[in-house]
Structure formats: C-alpha cells, structure tokens
Amino acid sequence: MLIQRIDIFCDYVLHKPLERVLHILDNIEDYYSEFERVKKDKFGNKKLNKPQYEHLGKYWTRIINPPRGDLKGIHKSINKYLVEKIRMPGYAFGGIKGKDNIRNARYHKGQKYIFQTDLKDFFPRITNKMVYKMFVGLGFSHDVSAMLTKLTTYKGHLPQGAPTSTTIANLVFVPTGMALQVIAEREGLRFTTFVDDVTMSSQTDFKNVVPEIIKTITSDGYKISQGKTTYKSGITEITGVKMLNNSMTVTDKFKATYVNEKDLTSPRAKGLLNYKKRIKAVSRAKKK
C-alpha cells in the first residue's frame, strides 16, 4: 500500500517535516546545481560531436542539474521508496540492482538479427506532466503525486544527474515498453531497454516489423536518434559489448583505450581490465 498523505510521506519516507519540504519547493532553484559536462563513453573517452571536428576538440556535451543540500537526500529517499515498493519491468536493465549493460547485451547473445535505437534527449523529453501521470497511475494520491513531481522534476522535465531520474524514466516509459513487449511476444523477439537504449533481437529476420517498432516509440512522444538506429545481422555491439556468433567480448574501442593506457597499474587501467573479465564471465555464465 502506497502512502497517500503528504505529511506522512514527508515524515516516514523523506524524513523531513512537511514545512521543510514546502520551503524547499518554494526555493527549488537554490537546491539544484547546473553545469555542462562533456559526454564520455563507457571507458571514459570523450565523445566527439563530429569525427571531422577532432582537430578542433569539439565534444558532445550535456547540461547536468544535480540536486544539492537537503534535496539530494530527499531524492535518494524517494528513489529508495520507489525501488522497494514498485516492481520494475522485466525488460529494463538500466539503473536496476543486479542488472547492467553487460547483462543487457547477454540477453541478446546468439541472436542473428538485432535492431537498436537510442531515445534522443530521453530525460529532457520526459515532462513534469508525464511524471505526474505516472505517479497517479502507480496509485499515489493526487497530492502526493503533485509533491513528488515537483521534487523530482526541474524546469519542466527530468533533470540529468538526479538520483531519481533513471528510476522515474523507467517507470514513465512503461506504457511504451509494454506496447513494445506485446510486439516482441507476438513476433518471438527478445526485447530490452538500458535507460535510453532500446534493443530487439531474433534468430529470424524481422525487418518488416521495424517500422511498427519505431512508430510505437515515436507515437508516445519520444524521438529516436537516426544515427544510432540500426538493424544488423552478424557481429555488432550492444550497450558497449561486442557480440560475436555466440559469445561476447570487449569492443575495438575498448581495446584501443586499454592499449593507450600509459600506466597499467593505475586505478583506471585496473578498472578496464576488470570490465573485460566481467564480460568474459557473464558471457560464459549459464542463463537462469
């Protein structure tokens, strides 16, 4: 049973009196930082905006708005409550305990045909209205839903860098995700999401289904990244893991990153090596 009264929710979940929470909401601008961060891949390499701009040093950037002070603790409490009380969809692998990008890739191991797309500007496109509708749909009262929405959205959308954003994004995406799950079950496909990455795969060619998959995503207000939308057979990459015929390994980009490490005893180099070992271990492990 979800808590329905905002005063009780503040006391027992947020560990703050209602008056304090209302004060934070009245001064919400004071509780968010804002800075620009260069996008990096899973190995810590900066992402170039366009390959031809490499000599100019132009990189992809994103605006980060992490909560600070009491609001940061409130976000952590909200996230803990949601994770404990709400069952996450089985297809979701991002931001969920016991799941990660490697296990997401492993779910598609051995599949011959693979469709992938990236949800462009995923967090910024999730509006406060979508978040409020999600909370009400979960069974929270309108008062609690309104308060949670105001606490977890900033400037009208989900903020990048907030502890709650990935969990909330997973939950907001559920109607679209379940529609994609219906398509997957009908066509005998495997389907997963890893935050803003959507993957479907099969042993048989399903190219004729791809337009329906894309339409299902975009009709709910999401936008796909054309440059990251692919349909392939054979060797490919899924969420930073290279997929071979029936095994997984590190990507060519990872190999280049590791080779270029000057100090192989550094924490970064050790982290890269452990990542490689994890892919190997997960690839060999039997599916439960």
Where are these regions (language model features)?
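Right-hand nucleic-acid polymerase module
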Residues: 1-55, 59-162, 171-184, 204-288
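Short beta-strand
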Residues: 190-194, 228
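Short beta-strand->loop micro-motif that forms the acidic, two-metal-ion catalytic signature
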Residues: 196-202
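Conserved binding-pocket/active-site segment within a compact domain
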Residues: 168
